[in-house]
Amino acid sequence: MTEPTHRGRAGVAVDAVTVGTRAGAPREDTGAPPPSPEGAGAHAIVTSGLTKRFRGGQVAVDAVDLAVPRGSVFGFLGPNGSGKTTTIRMLLGLVAPTSGTWSLLGTPMPAGLARALPRVGAVVEGPAFYPYLSGEANLRRLDAADPGADARTARARIGAALERVGLTAAAGKRYRNYSLGMRQRLAIAAALLVPRELLVLDEPTNGLDPQGTREVRTLIRRIAEDGTTVFVSSHLLSEVEQMCTHVGVMRTGRLVAQGPIAALRASGEEPRLRVETPDAGAAAAVLARAGLGDVRVADGEVTAVAGARAPEEICALLVGEGVAVRGFGVERPTLEEIFVGLTGEGFDVGA
């Protein structure tokens, strides 16, 4: 039978990066109070202190304060086992939290599940359909089981959903003959049989080949362009970087940072100047006298933190002091380096 799908609406942009505590540390004030679910109408998803402890004392999700902006594509990024799926299951009412509060589309949970979920579409832990039925027939059965769906418009809505995910030509094909990418797109179509304001996807590109990954990534962008807020979990850094506007970073159950991707980039280490020269000692002395910070010499290269000085000004200064400059550039930390610094471990970076 098909993966249960749940329905919902969206939230205000988080304009700055919020960096939380490292895993295992006490919960601390990060400079702003956690968002209040009662005042969460500007966000698609808001959590405050959301925690899940399993029997035996294992803490799967630890005091997560999450704020997903309305209209964003929010990447929920973290290594496997960091608590992403457990968080999603709590958001959708599939697992009860141990403590904390949350809201969907401005509606406090869990009391408002019946009101909020019809506006939320979700695909959690992979799609499941009848293999011997066609894609269209599977959607018909799903739609008929939805008490909120209008049977009079079923044919038109199913056709529109198939067209939206690019499966119109394969509508009559048996599900067992679908590629992995087609199966994932059919699951998204099932979640969008009626208009949704929030779409929650758990690892939607997991196990897909590069072509299937591109298909799903393109589809998510199109859905977001239509005004739906998309909350997508992933352990693939490249996926989050290519399709998301905002990101939350999980590590061993804790949310260690969240905000716009551009702001996260800016929150990394300061850019470093790199000078390739046969006169490394002289170049280092010039940079130090000019007030640049953290001057280092290694393997015929000199690096330093420029601060407010313009790179072209520094290059001209070196040349004016008689330093032979063979190469000059500015190195900024990659998104991968920033996230590894936040989590203390790496991410899969392949497509």
Model regions and ranges:
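Compositionally biased, low-complexity flexible segments
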Residues: 22-26, 30-34
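C-terminal coupling/interaction segments
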Residues: 2-20, 24, 306-351
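ABC transporter nucleotide-binding domains
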Residues: 42-47, 52-251
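Primarily ABC-family ATPase nucleotide-binding module
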Residues: 34-43
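ABC transporter nucleotide-binding domain
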Residues: 217-305
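Short, flexible helix/strand-to-coil boundary loops that buttress conserved ligand/catalytic motifs
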Residues: 143, 265-268, 342
